[in-house]
């Protein structure tokens, strides 16, 4: 093969790979509900507004990742690193007879 043809095939492959990645990203995005129109019955409008509210909640929610992993990590850190043994804690000097 000619070097020019190989570079074109590489560029074409990279472009197809980028399009494939972009299409995978757009599939995960929720689809906006369609407006039924101004003369739609009240039931259709109620369904539309409910779907629209759900759509807005989906696209504007905060994403923190898995909810269980920070709790596990916090527990692990607090138990292993921050836990003090009982002999390192200062002893109380409180004497109830002095009061």
From Swiss-Prot:
Locations listed in the record: Secreted
Keywords, ordered alphabetically: Amidation, Cleavage on pair of basic residues, Neuropeptide, Secreted, Signal
Disulphide linkage map: none
Ranges that cross the membrane: none
GO molecular function, one term: neuropeptide Y receptor binding
Modified positions (Tyrosine amide) in chain numbering: 64
UniProt signal peptide: 1-28
GO BP annotations listed: feeding behavior; neuropeptide signaling pathway
SMART domains per UniProt: PAH (SM00309)
Keyword Electron transport: no
GO CC annotations, alphabetized: extracellular space
PROSITE patterns (alphabetical): PANCREATIC_HORMONE_1, PANCREATIC_HORMONE_2
A Pfam family per the record: Hormone_3
Gene3D superfamilies: 6.10.250.900
Keyword Aminoacyl-tRNA synthetase included in the entry's annotation: no
Record-stated family: Belongs to the NPY family.
Primary role: NPY is implicated in the control of feeding and in secretion of gonadotrophin-release hormone.
Entry protein name: Pro-neuropeptide Y
Lineage: Eukaryota, Metazoa, Chordata, Craniata, Vertebrata
């Amino acid at each position: 093969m000619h070097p020019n043809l190989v570079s074109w095939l590489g560029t074409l492959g990279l472009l197809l790979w980028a399009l494939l990645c972009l299409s995978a990203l757009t599939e995960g995005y929720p689809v906006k509900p369609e407006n039924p129109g101004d003369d739609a019955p009240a039931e259709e409008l109620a369904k539309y507004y409910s779907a629209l509210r759900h759509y807005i909640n989906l696209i504007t929610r905060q994403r923190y990742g898995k909810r269980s992993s920070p709790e596990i990590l916090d527990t692990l850190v607090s138990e292993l690193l921050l836990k003090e043994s009982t002999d390192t804690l200062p002893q109380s000097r409180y004497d109830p007879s002095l009061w």
